[in-house]
């Protein structure tokens, strides 16, 4: 059986931790930031985790992580 390929788009966006959780960064933080207040931009800096079926799907795309 051939090697499974890693989905490169998913590899750039997600990180699978030792615990099995899938870490991701938040959207809406790249441009058009002048009208967003400081509190909102500060909250967007923090990473968050995928839950349930979403995490399972991403883990399937990243077989060697």
Swiss-Prot record:
GO cellular component: cytosolic large ribosomal subunit
Top-level division of the source organism's lineage: Bacteria
Gene Ontology terms: biological process: translation
PROSITE patterns: RIBOSOMAL_L35
InterPro entries linked: Ribosomal_bL35 (IPR001706), Ribosomal_bL35-like (IPR021137), Ribosomal_bL35_CS (IPR018265), Ribosomal_bL35_sf (IPR037229)
Keyword terms, alphabetized: Ribonucleoprotein, Ribosomal protein
GO molecular function annotation: structural constituent of ribosome
Pfam families per UniProt: Ribosomal_L35p
Keyword Ribosomal protein: yes
Family assignment from sequence similarity: Belongs to the bacterial ribosomal protein bL35 family.
Name of the protein described by the UniProt record: Large ribosomal subunit protein bL35
Organism lineage: Bacteria, Bacillati, Bacillota, Clostridia, Thermoanaerobacterales
């Amino acid at each position: 059986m051939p090697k499974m390929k890693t989905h490169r788009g998913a590899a750039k966006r997600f990180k699978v931790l030792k615990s099995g959780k899938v870490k991701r960064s938040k959207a809406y933080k790249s441009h058009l930031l002048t009208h967003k207040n400081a509190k909102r931009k500060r909250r967007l800096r923090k990473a968050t985790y995928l839950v349930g079926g979403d995490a399972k799907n991403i883990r399937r795309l990243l077989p060697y992580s």
